Structures are given as C-alpha cells and as structure tokens.
C-alpha cells in the first residue's frame, strides 16, 4: 500500500512534563516517531512543554515549539504551520485529550487525524461509548453505570453494588479513581473523579478485584493486518493499577486455549476501534471467564515495556502505519531482514517492578489501588522467572525493609502497599505457605512458587551448601553480594567457585534470524553471544529508574553523550541501564545496549567481557557518580585496561566531602555559609550551637536533597538526626548556616581542565531554603547586579579548575547583602542541563562528552551564549496523585518533572511556564491570600499590584485587617475551623481563582494543608512563596498588556 502522498507535514503533540502516570516513555515513543516519519520524507512539527526531552532537540524534528500544551495555543501553531496531519497517539493521555479538544473547537479542519481516529479516541476514553462498543461486538465488560452527577450515587450503589471500582474518563494513570467499599468512600472518590475528568464523567463498575490482569499490545495497519507484539501478565491481581503492578512477559500462567481466546478478543477490539497503529488492551481473567477492562488507543506505558521486552520498535512502526505503510512494508530494524508483520518471539523472561517515591514522602498514603503513585520503573531480563525477579529487585536500588512480624506481614499482603512484593519473600522466610499467601493476595501460585524457590535457596546457602548450589543460585539471579551475605564466605572464596556471566541477545525472533542491533542481558548459562572486538569503546552508565531527584534530565544527558561520541571518529558507545521508559534504552541509540542492574558488580561484569577505553559516570546522576570511587578501585585491583573518563573520582569526592571542599574554598578565597560535619548526635548539637540556628541539616552524598531539613532549635535537631543518620550510615551529617532571604543561583558549566565554558546562570524565583529542584528559575538573571554576575562567573571558573573538573559541573550559590556564597558544587550532569540547552541553544552535555575523550574547548570554538529572550523553568508537583503529602516546599525535593516558558520578557515567559505546569494564572476573578505576620509588609506591593490589575482579594481576618489598614481593599472569608461558609467552601463553589498561601510554622500547617489539598482537588492555581506571588503579579500584568509569543524554538536561537 503506498504512503499517503498528500501527507507532507505532520504535527506531533508531546506529553508534557514527567508526572505520576506519564513518565519518560512518551519521550521515547515521540522521538522514535519523529525519526520514523523523517525517514519517509515527512516534515515533522513537534510541540511539547518539557525541555528535558530528546524529542525537543533541534535534530529530532524539523520544527520545534516549546509551548504549554493547551488547545488554544496548539490551535495557533496549527494555523501557523498548516500541517497535513496530526499524530495524537505518541503523547500519552495528554496527546489524546489535546486532539479531542482541538477537534471539538474546530481547529483540525483540513488536518487529517493519523493512526488513532477521533472516533477511536472517544470510544476508548469515553466510558459510556467504550461500554456500548464492547456490548455491540459481543465482548464482556464488568457490570457498570455511567455517573455524571453526585445525585446519581445511590442509584449507582443499587445498580452495581459494593465494592465498586471508579474510573474517571480522560484521566491519566487512574487519577481520581479508586476502589470504594462503603457509600462514604464512593461519594469521596466520585466527587474527586468527576472533578478530574475532562468531560465530568466516571464509570462505576463491579469490582473484579482478585482476578488475573492480562495485557496485550496489538498492532494493526490499514490493510487490516493485526499482530500481537507482546502479551504481559500482572503478578498483582486486578484492583491494583497496572502501572503499580509487577508485570511479567511473556504470559506464563494461561493455557494455550485461554491465551488464544484473549488474543482473538484483542484483535477483534482493535478492528472495531479502527485503530491504525498500536493499541493496549487490558483483560481481567478468572477460571475461563474474562472481562474487557480498558483500551488505550495509543502508545502507552505498557507499549514502552512491550517494546523493550521484545525489541520490537512499536512507536516507529505505528508512525509509519499512520502515514499509510503496511506492516509487511516496514522493516524490523533489529534484525534488518524481517518485516514488522512478524510477531516477536522471546526466549527469556522479562519483569517490570515500579519505583515508588515513599522514601521522599513519609506521610503519603502508601496503599496501592487503581490510581498510580509510582514515579518510574525498572525492567530486568533473565532466563528464568527467579533470575528476572532477583535482577529487578537489585535494579530498584533502594533499601527494602525486612518484615519478621507475621501480623505485620499478613497486613501488608492483604492491604497492599509498595512493600508488598518484597514482603512476599519475607512471608516465605517466616514460614508462610504458598496456599496461605495465595489466599491473602490472590496472586497466582505459579509466581509464589518461584519466590519460594528463591527463599529455599537462601536457606540452603545459609546452612550446608555444595558448589553446585552456588551455581544454581547464580542462575536464579543471586549476586555475589547476596552470596557473600548468605554463605559468610570471603569474596576470594566465592570467586574461586568459578563462573562468569554470559550475555544473550534480545533480537525479537528467539534467535531465528541474526540481529543487527546488539541489545544484551546477562545470565549464567553457557554460550555467550557477546563478541569481543578491537574497537575503541566507551561505556556510559545510565540513570536507572525515574525517581524524585533523578528524572528524565539525566537520560537526556546520557543520550547527548552518546550522540557526541558517535560523532567522534572511531569511538563505539555502549550503555548500561535498566529503565524501559527511556530513549537511552532504545536499541538503536547506542552501538551496544546492556539491560542490567546499575550495581558495581553488574558494571564490572561488563567491563571484564571486553577491552574498554573508558567509563563515563557523570551523565547518570548521583547514583552513577556514587559508583565512581568503588569502580576505580575494582578496575585497579583487576588491572583492567580502562579508566573513569572525565573528572577523577578523587575530585568528585573532594566536591562531596564537606571538609575537603571547605578547604578548597578557603584557599580560593570564596565565601561559603558557616558549616561543619558531625559524626555523632553530640557533635551535631555542639556544631549547630556554634553556627547558630536556623541551620540546614542533611546527610552527605544524597540525591535531590533527600532527608534534608531546615532545623530551628535543638529539639528539632535531635528528632531529625536519627533519620539523617539512618539514611546515610557511612557518611557524616552536614550542618550549614541557613541564609535567610537570600537569592539562590544555579550555574551549569563545562571544563576541560584548562578552560571553563559557562552555559547558563539561572536565578531562582523562590529564595534559598526551597530545594533548587523545586524552585522556578530564569535565564538570564532578572535582578542580579553586573557585579554579582561577574563574581559568579569568576568563582565558577576557579572552583571548576580548582577541583580539576573535566566535563560538567553544577554550582549553587546564594546572594545576600551583595555577598555571593557557594552552597555546593556537583561535578556531574545536573537536572538543569537540558533547560540550559533549550534556553540558550548550547548543548552542554555533548560538549562535555567530547571534552572527556580529550577534545579542548578552545578547539571547538563554542562561545558563551548571549540571549535576547527569557526562559523560565517551572516544576510539576505530585500532590494531586499522593494524598497525605505535605505540600509545603522546603529543602527536600518533591517535584517529578519540569516545563519551560520562553518569550521576550520575564512576565510572559513566567506566565507560559505556570500555564504549562497546569497552574494557569487568572487575569480576572478572586484571589485568596493568607501569609505570615512577618511577610505582611512584603505582601503589600503584591496585593496592590493585583488590585490594580482588577483582581479581587479575599483573606482571613489578620491578612484582611492589615491590607485594609494599608489602603488595599480586601474581603473577609472564614478560616476552615471557624465554620461554614469558609475558604474551602469558596474554593469548592469556584469563586476563588488563585490561592496565595504561605504557612507560618508547623503549628499552622494543618490549615495550609487543607487549603492546598482543596486547591489540588478542584484544580485551582496555588502559590506557596511570596517570591512566586511577586512573579505571578508581574506575569498577569504582562499578559494583560501584550499577547504571548508563539514561535519555534529555532527562532529564539537564531536558527530560522
């Protein structure tokens, strides 16, 4: 079938910022789709708000817009670019929602919807239309009722019964949904679900909790050829969102006739929807009976997993199908000889385990339900289920608490939390049987037997074992670290037992055809498929699962390093990573991909298999950097012909070690806040007293400010120290003087050991004290004096050269009373590197990679950027997905993702950034303000400005009295505890359009938390710092005076 010859230009809508339910998988799929369409000569216009994506790179698409993903703005881009088609299925739920909205507002006249037709979007996303379609084609769905008004609750309970599952239409990651066991729960979940749904609709359906959950990834072309790319089976039963479940591929517990029944149904459904491209279909299955649960008529999170599990490039194939190609006309890039119409075959086991953020959010509700809470996931490949399970757990890279109390174990098994998968192992260790656990969890006994096999092996290794038992353990995924702990043998004795892992290839065809894209996993079988060669090779350590503090930004840096090194003649680039969502784990990103845990032992096994010129650790974030020192020690011990490239591990340690770094700053005559390191509680008390409260306390070697806190007195310090020491047992507690009312600055730079290139100086909107990852920031700085900027440049160069940095460095400063203080230096990639690249056009990560293999900055001819526009980075906070989380921003990071606003002045750029972060600032209506007594004087100019702009002010008694006394009109509204009607009632009614609420202290946080929770639930923009309120007033002022600019990114960089 010929390509659609009239499709010359296609618009792809990205998925926006990383958030719970929608992570890096859509950068992976969107980037793949852009490349696929450009291969076919189609011009690609891409719009996305997330600067930390590969798809927003200038060489991914022909025209790139970094703009808020709002239908009215995308409509302007469509009018300007005049695309022939729009590809909606690559941007996740956001892309589908935007396409539906654009169609409804008439913006798609003359624009063909490619791949997923509009009717399929409606039938897949509108719960009533989906149910009607399934009934029409004779496919069973759970008994259900559509609910659009709260007065239908009693009828829904009578019709469907309890427990019931609530599924809102057009939402992401099950947002706003849940399982209701009582009428009260039903009312609470339905109210939230209706508020979150784009069309104010929820489906209340009978619960099939406890049934098996099975997924099929299906592909279909215009000639009606359908294939199953991958079947996947959730270890967790129905009742837990698939994104929260442990997932196994291929399907292992269905008989062939059962599998064929579901396969036939999946193909029937994709045909009924008329989807041309990829589609994800979810089934509930029990004892020969099944129900259709959900259809995603787009590339999804499960698509990314299926793609990495099989090696089949789903997004690439779907994009080519969308412009008219048949499956048999599209080549499988992994084999290079088979068409995409061949169903993939796999001869190994893949396991996905989610990564949850509860190490950051101690107060969050950890219960797993139908709404997602995980931020990322890991994938492991093994020859057996046991091996894949063990490798997946190792890949999570977090401390799993062991449970020994049978009552506690029973509670976790019956009311699942993020601890349940690990607790299955604990249950067997404490003597639970397979039958008992199956009854408590509804998990298929097959998987429980595999976990029991692992625990039985542990017992054998702890007692009397034979060398053969060690070999069996290794084939079951046990690491050398596991073996040392269990056998109590020395490393030498374990090594003497012999054996090294072999590497097998993921090739989509179970070795039926040779693969041209080398994609490997380790196992302890015979026959290694990895071939040693003489090429000059570099191994880059990836960043692992997305978590708070370590997001897609580090994958961006990893991919840029690969791109840069592949431009250098004669360098072969290999990646090790375990995140199935990312571009770096796309099989054709690097010359060789290893899907492995990011542990010292696993990395060393790779290095021992081939001669590597060097290893790069600074692009994968703090976790990769933490491997630098032990990796170098092992390389030396084994006398391997490789080295850590770029900044030396000793220099990294000098930046992390507080005492060494302080001595360097003293020698360079650069100011820093008074600080010290304490190795005991007593030392900490003494040093905090000497420095003077308030102090900032944190463990050393942390990621994203983990366990960092602002401490005001000795009592707070004592309660904190226990937590900090537990988080980082091997390292001291760091105590810093807290600089109140200071402006914070971030700098990203590259050094080659001789020269330093400063890529960007970013001024934070929020003052020091809010974690840099949670603060909005702006390039170029808006309030810093030339003298301050000159000192920041000078200090950056001195520190980079003083540490001996070769590659990237990020330095954080605070400015108070015209003094520039250094807060910390990180000689590695930072989360702001992609933002700097998109704001300035300078690809720092690429430059750094070249410097690390010997290139000099002077030879590259890269000048420090000077820009005439303004770019603002704003963050996305996860409070709408994590009930119970404290919404107060502080020194510990909470955001999951970021967006960028770009325009020709600060006000409009900040307005765009807030809009992109789903915090759109109102230009009319009522603003509720509540601030501390200390902040009231600072509030006054902001309040006056908002009144000048025509907004009405509301507040509680203290704030209203102060404003009125100072000539600013304000209206009184009651506090929550003062009875109704109060501020929450006003928010619920829709009369409040913006919240400015800064909590005074821990005692006043309860009011703040209630107000902020209501703001999140009812979608009201909120501001928690006065600095952000000041910026918001500037943004509203700017937007009322002048329209925002809609221009391609290339225009800002002078490339178009």
From Swiss-Prot:
Segments forming domain ATP-grasp: 131-323, 662-853
Q: How is the cofactor bound, in the record's words?
A: Binds 4 Mg(2+) or Mn(2+) ions per subunit.
> What does the entry list as the binding residues for Mn(2+) 2?
294, 296
Which positions are annotated as binding ATP 2? 698, 737, 739, 744, 769-772, 812, 824
Q: In which pathway does it act?
A: Amino-acid biosynthesis; L-arginine biosynthesis; carbamoyl phosphate from bicarbonate: step 1/1; Pyrimidine metabolism; UMP biosynthesis via de novo pathway; (S)-dihydroorotate from bicarbonate: step 1/3
Residues involved in Mn(2+) 1 binding: 282, 294
InterPro entries given in the database record:
ATP-grasp, CarbamoylP_synth_lsu, CarbamoylP_synth_lsu_oligo, CarbamoylP_synth_lsu_oligo_sf, CbamoylP_synth_lsu-like_ATP-bd, CbamoylP_synth_lsu_CPSase_dom, MGS-like_dom, MGS-like_dom_sf
| KW Amino-acid biosynthesis (keyword) present | yes
Ranges for domain MGS-like:
919-1056
Residues reported in the UniProt entry to bind Mg(2+) 1: 282, 294
Q: Where does Mg(2+) 2 bind?
A: 294, 296
Region feature (Allosteric domain): 921-1056
Q: What is known of its domains?
A: The large subunit is composed of 2 ATP-grasp domains that are involved in binding the 2 ATP molecules needed for carbamoyl phosphate synthesis. The N-terminal ATP-grasp domain (referred to as the carboxyphosphate synthetic component) catalyzes the ATP-dependent phosphorylation of hydrogencarbonate to carboxyphosphate and the subsequent nucleophilic attack by ammonia to form a carbamate intermediate.
Query: How does this protein assemble?
Result: Composed of two chains; the small (or glutamine) chain promotes the hydrolysis of glutamine to ammonia, which is used by the large (or ammonia) chain to synthesize carbamoyl phosphate. Tetramer of heterodimers (alpha,beta)4.
Quote the protein name from its UniProt record: Carbamoyl phosphate synthase large chain
Q: Which gene encodes it?
A: carB
